[in-house]
Curated annotation (Swiss-Prot):
It catalyses: alpha-D-glucosamine 1-phosphate = D-glucosamine 6-phosphate. GO terms for cellular component: cytosol. It comes from the Bacteria. The active site is at S101. NCBIfam families: glmM, PRK10887.1. GO terms for biological process: carbohydrate metabolic process; peptidoglycan biosynthetic process; UDP-N-acetylglucosamine biosynthetic process. It comes from Coxiella burnetii (strain CbuG_Q212). InterPro entries: A-D-PHexomutase_a/b/a-I, A-D-PHexomutase_a/b/a-I/II/III, A-D-PHexomutase_a/b/a-II, A-D-PHexomutase_a/b/a-III, A-D-PHexomutase_C, A-D-PHexomutase_C_sf, Alpha-D-phosphohexomutase_SF, GlmM_bact. The lineage of its organism: Bacteria, Pseudomonadati, Pseudomonadota, Gammaproteobacteria, Legionellales. Its EC number is 5.4.2.10. This is Phosphoglucosamine mutase.
Length: 446
C-alpha cells in the first residue's frame, strides 16, 4: 500500500508548509500514541536537533501523545543514534527524533524508532497513517500521559559510546578537530573524545537555532579541512545536524568519505578475525573502488537503494553486520542499530591507534574511481525515465563513457532535487558528462 505521509526516512518538509506544522504534529503524536497504547500504558522518548522549530514540534507531539494516554520522556538536543540506543536501554515503547538531518534550518521532520532501536516497519508506519486520518479524541483525565525531562540522557549516551572503545586504549597523543555542524552532537561529541584522552578543538559547536549545517558539518567540510591544517591536527571529524553520519579529514586536510571509512573498517575486521564480515552492504551510489577493494580481500559486496533503512534491510536479509553510504551513514550492528557518527569515528580512531598509522595511510587501501555528484533543484515531480531531453542526454553520456563507467539519475528522498552521479576512469570525461546531464535535467524543469 502506498504511504500518504511517511517518506524514506520518516516525515520531512518545510516548516509551516506541508506536514511540518503544529496542527499536523499534534495529530501525529496522537496517532502514534493510539497505535502504541492499544494494549498497555506506553512510554515514548523524544529527542531533537537544534533547529528553532524543534520547540514547536516537540510541544505538539508531546500534547498529542499525552492526549492518547502515552507518557513522554524528553531528552532535549541529542543525536539520532542516541535516541535509538536510549529507547532500547530504558525499555521505552518507541523513540522519536525531531530533525531534518543534513538540511538547513527551514526544514524539519520526524523519524521514529521501535522499542529495539530500529526504524519502524512499513506496516507500523501504515498503521500510524490510518490513525492520522481518524477524528482525534482525548482520553479521560486520569489516563492522560505525563511528561518528564530525562536529565541523565547525555551522560548515559556518552558512557555507552566510550564503552565501544577498547578499555586498554586511549586517544592520548591525538589532536582532533571536531565539527559538530551546530547540531545535535554539540553537547556530547567533544566530551567523548576528550574523556578518552584526545586534545579536542571543537568548531561549529554553538547552535543558535538557525545555523545548523550552515557552511559546516558533513556536507560542507571546507572549514574543517582548513582548521585541521591550521591546528596541525591528526584528524578532523564532521557530523551532520543529527549526528548519524560522519565524514573525516586526514592530517593533510583531505576528505575521507563514507566509502573509504567503510572499507577501512571492513578490512580491519577481516584481518582481526573479530566479527569478520561475511559481506558488506553499500548502495547504488557507492564508489566502484569500494566494491573492487573488498572483493580483492574476499569480502562480498552488495548494493541497496540509497537510504540507511535500505542498507540495514539488506544487511539483515544477508545476516551481515556492516554497511553504509558514501555520505557517511555507516551501520555497525556489532554496536548500534542505526548509523552513528560518534561510534564510527571511534572505530576509525581505534584502528589508527592500533595500527600506529595516520588516516592518510589507512585510506590508501582503497583506490577511488573518479565520481561526480551534482544535485539539480526541481519544482514538483520530474519523470526522469520518460523525459525525452533527459533520455537523449543519457544516450549521449553513455557514448562519452564508452562502456567504462556508471550513470545514475535519481530523485532525492529527502530534498526537492535530482541527484546526477557519473563514475568512470577519466576524471575530465566524468565531470564533463555529469555537467551535461545536469544541464539536461535543469532544462527539463523550466
Amino acid at each position: 500500500m502506498q504511504k500518504k505521509y511517511f517518506g524514506t526516512d520518516g516525515i520531512r518538509g518545510k516548516v509551516g508548509n506541508s506536514l511540518i506544522n503544529a496542527e499536523f504534529m499534534l495529530k501525529l503524536g496522537w496517532a502514534v500514541g493510539r497505535v502504541l497504547a492499544n494494549s498497555h500504558s506506553a512510554t515514548v522518548l523524544i529527542g531533537k536537533d537544534t533547529r528553532i522549530s524543534g520547540y514547536m514540534i516537540e510541544s505538539a507531539l508531546q500534547a498529542g501523545l499525552s492526549a492518547a494516554g502515552v507518557n513522554i520522556k524528553l531528552t532535549g538536543p541529542m543525536p539520532t543514534p542516541a535516541i535509538a540506543y536510549l529507547t532500547h536501554s530504558v525499555r521505552a515503547d518507541a523513540g522519536i527524533v525531531i530533525s531534518a538531518s543534513h538540511n538547513h534550518y527551514p526544514d524539519n521532520g520526524v523519524k521514529f524508532f521501535n522499542k529495539d532501536g530500529f526504524k519502524l516497519s512499513d506496516e507500523l508506519e501504515l498503521a500510524i497513517e490510518k490513525q492520522i486520518d481518524k477524528p482525534m479524541k482525548t482520553v479521560v483525565a486520569d489516563r492522560l500521559g505525563k511528561a518528564a525531562r530525562m536529565n541523565e540522557a547525555h551522560g548515559r549516551y556518552i558512557e555507552f559510546c566510550k564503552s565501544t572503545f577498547p578499555s586498554n586504549l586511549t586517544l592520548k597523543g591525538l589532536k582532533i578537530v571536531v565539527d559538530c555542524a551546530n547540531g545535535a552532537a554539540y553537547a556530547v561529541a567533544p566530551s567523548i573524545f576528550h574523556e578518552l584522552g584526545a586534545e579536542v578543538v571543537a568548531i561549529a559547536d554553538d547552535p543558535d537555532g538557525f545555523n545548523i549545517n550552515q557552511t559546516c558539518g558533513a556536507t560542507d567540510t571546507a572549514h574543517l579541512q582548513e582548521m585541521v591544517v591550521k591546528h596541525n591536527a591528526d584528524v578532523g571529524i564532521a557530523f551532520d545536524g543529527d549526528g548519524d553520519r560522519l565524514i573525516m579529514v586526514d592530517h593533510h586536510g583531505l576528505r575521507v568519505d563514507g566509502d573509504e571509512l567503510l572499507c577501512i573498517m571492513a578490512i580491519d575486521r577481516f584481518y582481526l578475525k573479530e566479527n569478520a564480515p561475511l559481506g558488506v552492504v553499500g548502495t547504488i551510489m557507492s564508489n566502484l573502488g569500494l566494491e573492487q577493494t573488498l572483493k580483492r580481500h574476499h569480502i562480498a559486496f552488495e548494493r541497496s537503494p540509497v537510504g540507511d533503512r535500505y542498507v540495514l534491510d539488506l544487511m539483515q536479509q544477508k545476516g551481515w553486520f556492516l554497511g553504509g553510504e558514501s555520505s557517511g551513514h555507516i551501520v555497525d550492528l556489532g554496536f548500534t542499530t542505526t548509523g552513528d557518527g560518534v561510534i564510527t569515528a571511534l572505530q576509525i580512531l581505534r584502528i589508527m591507534q592500533q595500527a600506529e598509522k595516520p588516516l592518510a595511510d589507512l585510506k590508501k587501501v582503497m583506490v577511488k574511481h573518479p565520481q561526480v555528484l551534482i544535485n539539480v533543484p526541481i519544482k514538483g515531480i520530474l519523470d526522469i525515465a520518460q523525459n525525452p531531453n533527459i533520455k537523449k542526454a543519457i544516450t549521449e553520456a553513455e557514448k562519452q563513457l564508452n562502456g567504462a563507467g556508471r550513470i545514475l539519475l535519481r530523485p532525492s528522498g529527502t530534498e526537492p532535487v535530482i541527484r546526477v552521479m557519473v563514475e568512470g576512469s577519466d576524471e575530465g570525461i566524468v565531470r564533463q558528462t555529469a555537467e551535461m546531464l545536469a544541464a539536461a535535467v535543469q532544462q527539463s524543469t523550466l
